[in-house]
Swiss-Prot record:
Originating gene: CHST1
Annotated 3'-phosphoadenylyl sulfate binding sites: 69-75, 234-242
Origin species: Homo sapiens
Entry protein name: Carbohydrate sulfotransferase 1
Pathway: Glycan metabolism
Record's catalysed reaction(s): 3'-phosphoadenylyl sulfate + keratan = adenosine 3',5'-bisphosphate + keratan 6'-sulfate
A Pfam short name: Sulfotransfer_1
Length: 411
């Protein structure tokens, strides 16, 4: 009788195990992105060739957009910010840099870099755990009772500008535009914001303050995190043109060169070469596919995203294992064929994306482009950016300067 009882117990346990396995298999099975896109009116256009991906719905995904200034990172950030189940933060490492690195050094020394990277990794680790209190160490003046009005670009985060973190007058689903967020929301309560973070399945952070993917290795290998790195790159010539227009004082000598046709003797060429060196070092690491980056790294060229934003966004979400939200699809539809007058704000995201990616060719003189091509020839070749052999070729929009490359995720 005792043996029969044990046999029944074993059978029951086996049955539970089988059911659990079946449930796990079902929840992790492939879901097609098209049902969500149908709500945005995009299914007919996208579903025929849209790939299917296996989605992991049980574990929080931690996403880091690794980029540099004027590479399209604000646009990529919005691809996550618009997802209803993603908690997105725009440049929280700004606070680290602003607190630790003296403005006059701009963080260029090796010592500054080590200090910045160590503090940045600690902060990122805490933020991915939704520990927003850790950010208070870098906010001036210090928050009082965990409330502050000093969060950098708070308005760029959808969650921080909507209920329950912000309670403006209006409908329950109201999300404020960035310019209205701070004015109408008042002080940010970090306790409430942290709770909103914990309620979401994924956390995404954008940064332009980590030079290379190798600087993130400790976080990538941290078993407590499910970190996936989206490295965004852009043609360095395009970055130079965009920075010269946006940061007019800092890049004054480049503008002087463009205006006079003569290269200033005291031109700070590191404003260009540092970008190229960081890209080259980071991409070399990523494309070598070291074991610690397996399933953790995806290289995205801004030009590919600009030419086909929906297709590339689907690939990104597929790599992350997250279903594509219809709100993201709708945002792409509304913000990649925009009125050019709406894209004049230097940090704006409403634009004709394909035209924006090529605009640099008409904003730099050929002698500046030739100089950049010589200084950055290694990374241009690595990333598939073609050399403009003449001014005629540079200014001819029918001649593409971007090679067809398939930078597949390392999975």
């Amino acid at each position: 009788m005792q043996c029969s009882w044990k046999a029944v117990l074993l059978l029951a346990l086996a049955s539970i195990a089988i059911q659990y396995t079946a449930i796990r298999t079902f929840t992790a099975k492939s879901f097609h992105t098209c049902p969500g896109l149908a709500e945005a009116g995009l299914a007919e256009r996208l579903c025929e060739e849209s790939p299917t991906f296996a989605y992991n719905l049980s574990r929080k995904t931690h996403i880091l957009i690794l980029a540099t200034t004027r590479s399209g990172s604000s646009f990529v950030g919005q691809l996550f910010n618009q997802h209803l189940d993603v908690f997105y933060l725009f440049e929280p490492l700004y606070h680290v840099q602003n607190t630790l690195i003296p403005r006059f050094t701009q963080g260029k020394s090796p010592a500054d870099r080590r200090v910045m990277l160590g503090a940045s990794r600690d902060l990122l680790r805490s933020l991915y755990d939704c520990d927003l209190y850790f950010l208070e160490n870098y906010i001036k003046p210090p928050p009082v009772n965990h409330t502050t009005d000093r969060i950098f670009r708070r308005g760029a985060s959808r969650v921080l500008c909507s209920r329950p973190v912000c309670d403006p007058p209006g409908p329950a689903d109201l999300v404020l535009e960035e310019g209205d967020c701070v004015r109408k929301c008042g002080l940010l309560n970090l306790t409430v914001a942290a709770e909103a973070c914990r309620e979401r399945s994924h956390v995404a952070i954008k940064t332009v303050r980590v030079p290379e993917v190798n600087d993130l290795r400790a976080l990538v290998e941290d078993p407590r995190l499910n970190l996936k790195v989206i490295q965004l790159v852009r043609d360095p010539r395009g970055i130079l043109a965009s920075r010269s227009e946006t940061f007019r004082d800092t890049y004054r000598l480049w503008r002087l060169w463009y205006g006079t046709g003569r290269k200033p003797y005291n031109l700070d060429v590191t404003q260009l070469t540092t970008v190229c060196e960081d890209f080259s070092n980071s991409v070399s690491t990523g494309l070598m596919r070291p074991p610690w980056l397996k399933g953790k790294y995806m290289l995205v060229r801004y030009e590919d995203l600009a030419r086909n934003p929906m297709k590339k966004t689907e690939e990104i979400y597929g790599f992350l294992g997250i279903p594509l939200d219809s709100h993201v699809a709708r945002w792409i539809q509304n913000n990649t064929r925009g009125d050019p007058t709406l894209g004049k704000h230097k940090y704006g995201t409403v634009r004709n994306s394909a035209a924006t990616a090529e605009k640099w060719r008409f904003r730099l003189s050929y002698d500046i482009v030739a100089f950049a091509q010589n200084a950055c020839q290694q990374v241009l070749a690595q990333l598939g950016y073609k050399i403009a052999a003449s001014e005629e070729e540079l200014k001819n929009p029918s001649v593409s300067l971007v090679e067809e490359r398939d930078f597949r995720p390392f999975s």
